[in-house]
């Protein structure tokens, strides 16, 4: 996935070139081996995190995927979960496949060193993603996008044939391809800081409007690539997200580092998800279901079972979905909204604010930023991102993730007093909580600063 001359490249945690890949953006080493406009991301299987938690000195074997395909006749990257683990161990035990053996600790050190120094690699927990994929019956999710919030089925474009013709003296080469699955982001965000999130009826109407608008985008959009149009019309995937998360908490007098925060976010995102599913199945009744609905987790009810939606209203909605279908294959994805949140006068995405007031550089311009609706009533609820205990952010992300069928752009904010062990603990906590992706690790040197309250 690319944007503004940058590209995100995802590599499996067992890939032979992983150590070099993890040093693409670091400041030391051979500059000829650097790619500073590449944003590296790593796809982790559950096995890696289990070993990091239980036996970090365990061996970890890096292999060439092409060699595996040649020797074993299958692509290891085409599997996930227990089937992947079985085939991984099969490859490890096959003497015909060359291994670059290190320890889990070696890889963890490289990952964390790069994360602290450069903010990357992004983390993609592939087994968690695919276990919760509502459309696993038709494919697999291999990676995410540049902002780590998209999680949709992917498949490569396949070459079928090439024919050479001569017409009127001109040579024409005709290439036939199978289109694969070319993921497109159709995104919008709810400005939580400006919405009465406690009003269930109001939220349902708002979400219904957003879902309908995003569905219309699919039909009205211009597609420069035919592959994108075909995939978009087959899955009709959308990504409704949020902005103004910290704004929402501060307006209600909720501290970020509190159990009240966790309970509130769980309730809000369950409401958003319920409203989205309800609106989408109604849209399916009106306009028709997406082409691959049959056999999906939506149709079988597995979507609701995996998320432990057992209340009477959820059970009733699951029955309605099974009968009416769904208009869109994927519904929710929380993007960063770092620019659009400025226009909306709210905080970015699901992030805590950087400071109560600061200067931010955007496209070469310095913009003064003030926490939204900053007043004596909200002042003490706007704690700066780098001062927040990140375990609260991770726990909140885990609660939100249950209600988000795709992923969320979730950043970690650390200072230089964090040890590598503490950062690893955050990754492990996120994995255990079911968080699908981690975006940037935003580090900041500790500075001796005057108290904002006093200096103001």
Kindly label every feature range from the protein language model.
Residues 11-14, 21, 63, 124-127, ...:
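Generic beta-strand/beta-sheet core signal
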Residues 1-189, 196-197, 223-227, 276, ...:
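Active-site cavity-forming subdomains of large catalytic enzyme subunits
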Residues 1-7, 179-184, 197-222, 277-281, ...:
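A structural-propensity feature for long, helix-poor, extended segments
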Residues 3-8, 29-31, 89-97, 172, ...:
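Glycine- and acidic
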Residues 13-17, 211-219, 231-253:
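Core structural elements
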Residues 9-17, 42-43, 65-73, 125-137, ...:
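A glycine-rich phosphate-binding loop feature that marks nucleotide/adenosyl-phosphate handling sites
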Residues 148-152, 214, 218-219, 303, ...:
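Catalytic alpha/beta core of large soluble enzyme barrels
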Residues 206-229, 255-337, 426:
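Internal maturation/activation junctions in enzymes
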